Amino acid sequence: MSILVIDALARASGSRYSTFDVVGAGPRVVAGIIKNAGFKTDLKAYELVINKPEILRKYKAIMISAMSSDKGALSRLLSLVEKINYKGYIIVGGPISFEYKELLRNNPRINYVLIGEAEIPLPKLLDKILTGKNVGGVPAIAFRDESGEIKATSPHLYTPAEIISRNKPWIEIEKSYPDHKIYRYYVEVVRGCSNYFRPVISGVNGLNCIKCFICRKGDLEKRMYCPANIPPGCGFCSVPYMFGPARSRSIDSIVEEIRELIIHGAKRIVLSAPDFLDYGRDLLVKPKPLTDPCYPEPNIEMIEALLSSIFEIEEVRNRNTRIFIENIKACLVNEDVARILGKYLSGTTIHIGLETGDTKYNSLVLGKPISVEHVYKAVKLLKAYGLRPYVYLMYGLPLANEKVYRKTLKTINKLSSLGVEKITLYKFVPLPGTAFQDLKPDIKRHSRIINLIKKKVEKHNLMSKKSLIGRKIHVLLLYNNGKYYGYPINHGPTVFVKGLTSPRFSGCEALVEIYDVAPRFVWGKFIRILAC
């Protein structure tokens, strides 16, 4: 049985509006699960399918990986399936799977929704489909029964770390993504999140914290369950509910995956984790689950062992392939952490979530363990060791008042003075599986001060990018719709490349000189091709 996995992540209504060069870990993990189970498998980016629908006919089953924000892209794929009269099975997975009732109710062409992690249920589901047996015994699957009633066989499962490590993700990226050399490939190193704090609020849309504080001070295992049924983690984040406590993959499995991705053309690899500094911390509390966001301290030995093993790969050591990490929690940053990250990753970006400048609000309302002072300290240490900090902020969050926004304005000033390279400002969007899933963004009431924050962030980002004017940087080129985009080798703002017209250099590495900037993008003059 031939099975196609379609990567529709971050395609929104059918096209990308940002992060054009990102390949998430999930679809490659899923394709690996299917291939390792003995099925003939292909993985294709959304764009390769939407433009050549006839390829769908050769597959017995199609699995579409998507997020809640990708419903438009999913709808387009389902319309395509109908148009070509496709007769096989349609399975939907990824973060969007937690909306399985809506998916199955509104999309009769979907046969099954795989809820949550795929390692355990997916091979069983495919085996049942192949043999024509009833799928009722397969865990974490949603479907319509003969009467049309929507059923789920069980809640979603959290895959043990040893099973995650045993799976070999898909690495044949040249078959799956156009211009495959230009992307940042996310390699999963930690699944799940250690923040099992919860919002300490009551009387707000079903949130009724009883102030037991088990989630903050109790036994690590007991923190997984809330007497008031409040989902774990920051109120706006679905990771703890969907993917459970942090579990680390083995060093050998990570290094093997990176080595093979490089053989197949990868030039940039992100060590993917909700928090990279959770890597190996789960081993410090084993057999308990890692459900405390800040204690114990980072497992320095494991982090260095991982990074040193990766940098033993010749292409990484010679900097022909670049390695990045993304998100970290500021409460875990200390001198040892900054030293180790600087030793291996100097010159690269690193992302820190803060959300607002009000520490009390962050803790009690958001369920976030990070103080403003944590972030200031982390920024100073990381910059001192050669990292380039980015900081996340949010607006429209529930119960955020004028005081919260005033403090956020002051915090932006401080972050600017500390030399934060970029501040990323997000609008709050309620997601399924979060404490705030039934709350709407609160923007109109505070629109004036929110606009001040937007302008201040925009000004900061513009001033920061002005330092790039006149600099010559290495970029990977992507030709699209008559234009060239450049993605900096060491990460940074997308470059609109001028002075190069022939499409034959797409996928090549080039040298460009930055000559103008905007808050989100920069413009660069093409100088020469460095490698193809």
Locate each region found by the language model.
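Terminal RNA-binding accessory module
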Residues: I443-C532
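Catalytic cores of alpha/beta
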Residues: E102-P108, D336-L341, L399-K414
